[in-house]
């Protein structure tokens, strides 16, 4: 609120306004039983380790994705490397969903060798307050 009150009433050129989006994923691991006939899923706390590995991987730079830690070791946040610009351009607005899908695909492929997966869960905006 203090940021809002500090800037309310000021004219800010539209080209200085930027916006973005983020996706928060829960990190899971698939554990196979020794007999190899069944598996179970558990939440993984390897988030910080996998985030560091991903962000130093050339795939991350090429796909313009940055991962950051979220609430616990089992949550990660994926954001674009740069914010969207402020122009109300339909192409930019329509690219948002495509970028979210691309991030999920890249991250899913990255996690396969680690036997990990990601899930998302829609939440009410005020859930964390």
Residue ranges of each PLM-predicted region?
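Terminal catalytic/cofactor-binding subdomain
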Residues: 1-129
